[in-house]
């Protein structure tokens, strides 16, 4: 569905933002 595709895009964006932070710790 369109909603699922949007959710996937949001999850990928959040991962891209929080990945360096997680990493950092």
UniProtKB/Swiss-Prot annotation:
Superkingdom of origin organism? Eukaryota
Keyword annotations from UniProtKB, A to Z? Copper, Oxygen transport, Secreted, Transport
MF terms (GO), sorted A to Z: oxygen carrier activity
GO CC entries: extracellular region
Q: Provide the primary localization.
A: secreted
Q: In which tissues is it expressed?
A: Hemolymph.
Q: Name one GO biological process term.
A: oxygen transport
Q: Tell me where it resides.
A: Secreted, Extracellular space
Q: What does this protein do?
A: Hemocyanins are copper-containing oxygen carriers occurring freely dissolved in the hemolymph of many mollusks and arthropods.
Family under the similarity heading: Belongs to the tyrosinase family. Hemocyanin subfamily.
Q: What is this protein called?
A: Hemocyanin subunit 2
Q: What is the lineage of its organism?
A: Eukaryota, Metazoa, Ecdysozoa, Arthropoda, Crustacea
